[in-house]
Amino acid sequence: AAKLMMETGFDAVEIHFSHGYGLSQFISPKTNRRTDAYGGSLENRMRLPLRALEAVRRAVGDDFPILGKIGLTDGVRGGLRIEEAIEVAAMLDRAGIDALICSGGTSSFNPMVYFRGETLDKGLVEVETNPIAKLGLKLIGPKMFRYYPYEELYFLEGARRVRDRVNCQMVYIGGCTDLESVEQVMQEGFDFIQLGRPLIKDPAFVNNARANPDYKNGCIHCNRCATLIEAPGGVYCPLNEEERAS
């Protein structure tokens, strides 16, 4: 898959080591209960993720950038914590990863760690068409989607600790909507910024910010866009639709 991306013309590939997906389930002590060479100590839990990185590097060569998204915390009891996350970053750095992105949370246990702002359960119930799934969301949604108030640069403290430990480049993610936040992140030595919801609100974020020093993105972190991930029309910003209709 990585080789296909390179041959298709992409500039880099990102390996997902976080959010509760496959490689993350090996890294996290919450989900990795193995008793063989792939479970137990952090070195064992990192065995498969490091093999994945090695395989991708072998496929794309030394000149194609490989990024890795790691979790600073799983946000759940018994899960990954910042101290181990820093060691994960150091292992990936030593293995030759080109850049790291520090996120957090898990899709199945506590996704609001990386979303922040309004919770997703009400919006997911609204767009769900399966009556059984809709009922399930109503019952478990409030427990699964805990409320974490939005604040700018909510992963900055943990990302700094990783930055100070590794030699690879660093990509900041997490609450970077205001231009002041963008400036702060770059001044602190991060090499790139990864944007999600601000680009859903305004795909021309970068060009508009460059042209207007007083630019405001307009994302209010309602997370309604995220609840549309399974909707027939795909993900979009409902605020933009409402603004056009008014």
Feature-to-residue mapping (PLM):
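Flavin-dependent oxidoreductase catalytic cores
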Residues: A1-S246
